[in-house]
Regions:
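Short alpha-helical "recognition helix" segments of helix-turn-helix
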Residues: 205-207
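Non-catalytic pre-domain segments flanking phosphatase-related domains
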Residues: 1-16, 222-227, 252-258
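Conserved non-catalytic scaffold segment of RNase H-like nuclease domains
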Residues: 1-113, 124-125
Length: 263
C-alpha cells in the first residue's frame, strides 16, 4: 500500500472495536504444533476495554521444556485444562467480531485457522478487518531498534508484569494499538505522511510498491540514487518509504507521458 492508502486504512481502524488475540503454543508451525493458551480482549478507543477472557488448553501433545521455560506453562498446568474442542467453540463468536488484532498477526491467525480446522470449522477474516501491531509499529516507530512486544512494553513503560503469557500479551498489544491509533486520530495528514515516509522497507516490500521483481527494484532504486541502509550480519538493504514512493510516482508520471505520446 501507498502511504495515502495506509493513512485511510488506519484512520478507519481507529474507530473500530479491536478484537485483540494472543496464543501460546507448543511450537512455531501451526501444522505441527498446538495452542496451549488463548486470550481475547475486546476494546475501542472510544470506550476502552469491553471484555477479556483467557483459557489454558490441553493440547493432548507434550509441551516441550523450551516452551515451558519461555512461557511458564508446564505439562502439569495444561493437563488440568479443558480440551481444545471444549474451548474453541466459545471463542469463535468473539474472534469473528471487530478488527482481529495481534502483535505479529500472521502467527496468531495461522494458529487460529489451524485449531478451527481440527474441528472442521472454517475461520477467515478479510484483510480489511485485520490489524497487525508489528506492521503498525514499523510504520509509526521506524527508528526504534526493536518492535518486539517486550521491548515496546519496556520502551513505553506499559504496566505489564510478565511477557509470553496470553493475557498479559493481549493487554500489551491493546495498549500499543491504543497509543498508536490515538496518534493517528489526532495528528494531521501532513504530519502522519511525513512520519510514514521515514519507515524502512525491505527490498521485497519496496518491490511490491514499485510493482517489480526484487532484482528490477534494486536496479531501479540504484539508478535513482536511492541509498539504502544496510542492517544485520548480512548487510541487508532497507529503503525509506518516502524514497520508494517518490520513485513510484516518477514511474507513474513517465508511463502516463508515454501513453499521451502514443496518442
Amino acid at each position: 500500500m501507498l502511504s495515502t492508502d495506509l493513512l485511510f486504512f488506519y484512520r478507519q481502524v481507529s474507530h473500530q472495536v479491536l478484537t485483540v488475540v494472543d496464543v501460546e503454543t507448543t511450537g512455531h508451525q501451526p501444522d505441527s504444533s498446538r495452542v496451549i493458551e488463548i486470550s481475547v480482549l475486546q476494546a475501542s478507543l472510544e470506550s476502552g476495554i469491553h471484555h477479556q477472557q483467557t483459557h489454558l488448553i490441553n493440547p493432548q501433545v507434550p509441551v516441550p521444556p523450551s516452551i515451558t521455560q519461555f512461557t511458564g506453562i508446564s505439562q502439569e498446568m495444561v493437563a488440568q485444562a479443558p480440551l481444545a474442542e471444549d474451548v474453541w467453540q466459545d471463542y469463535l463468536p468473539l474472534l469473528n467480531m471487530g478488527t482481529l488484532t495481534a502483535h505479529n498477526l500472521s502467527f496468531d491467525y495461522g494458529f487460529l485457522q489451524s485449531e478451527f480446522r481440527h474441528l472442521d470449522i472454517g475461520f477467515t477474516r478479510p484483510n480489511s478487518e485485520q490489524l497487525c501491531t508489528v506492521i503498525l509499529a514499523r510504520l509509526m516507530l521506524p527508528d526504534l531498534p526493536s518492535r518486539s512486544l517486550p521491548n515496546l512494553v519496556q520502551h513505553f513503560d506499559f504496566p505489564i508484569a510478565t511477557s509470553h503469557r496470553a493475557e498479559a500479551d493481549t493487554l500489551a498489544c491493546w495498549l500499543l494499538a491504543k497509543l498508536l491509533l490515538t496518534e493517528i486520530q489526532n495528528e494531521s495528514d501532513e504530519t502522519l505522511l511525513d512520519r510514514f515516509a521515514k519507515q524502512w522497507l525491505s527490498l521485497r516490500d519496496a518491490a511490491a510498491i514499485l510493482g517489480m521483481s526484487t532484482q528490477q527494484a534494486r536496479a531501479a532504486l540504484k539508478r535513482s540514487h536511492v541509498k539504502p541502509r544496510l542492517v544485520g550480519q548480512y548487510r541487508t538493504p532497507q529503503y525509506q518509504r518516502g524514497d520508494v514512493e517518490q520513485l513510484f510516482r516518477a514511474n507513474q508520471s513517465s508511463n502516463q507521458l508515454s501513453l499521451l505520446q502514443d496518442f
